[in-house]
Amino acid sequence: MTYKLSRWSLNDLFPASHGGVDSPELETAFDQIEEQVTTFEGVRGKLRADMPVDEFLHIVQTSEVTTRIVNKLDAFAGLAFAADTQDQAAQTLQNRVQQFMADMGNRTLFFGLWWKGLDDANAKRLMDASGDYRYYLEEMRHFKPHTLTEPEEKIVNIKDVTGSSALVNLYDAITNRYVFKLKVDG
C-alpha cells in the first residue's frame, strides 16, 4: 500500500480557493502592512530621549500590531512553500513576502537603531514603565554591540533576501523532489 501524503489547510491564516495562494485577504494584509509602515515612518521625528512614556508605549504597540500581521503573512508563505516546493505560485509568494519584509524592515529600521542608541538612563526609564514589552526592549538592546549604521543594516536586509534565504529556498526545492521507497519488513 502506498502512503499518500495529505496537504494541510492554510485557510485559518488566509482563506484561499483550492488551498492556493490567491486569497483576497492576503492582498489586504500586504496593503495593511504598507499603510501601517507608512504611518510608523511618521514617528521618526518624534523619537527623543526624554519622550513621555505613554507616547513611547504607543509607538511600541503600533509596531507590535504590524509585526503580528507580518508574521502571519510570512508564516502563510513559508507553509505554502513547505507544502509543495515545486508549486510556482508558492515559490513566487515566498519570494514576494521575503522581499516585501526586507523593504518594510528597512523602512522601520530607524526605531530599533534609535532604541539601541538611547542612553541607559532613559532606556531604563522607558523599560520600567513598559510592562510586557520590557523583555522585548531589553533583548533589542543586547544587540547594540553588533549593530551597524542604518545604511549598512539596510544592505544586510536586502542581501539576506537574495543571499542566504535564496540558497535555503533552492536547497529546499531540490531536496523536496527526493522520493524514498521503504519496504517494511514485518
How would you name each of these model-derived features?
Residues 1-186:
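A well-structured
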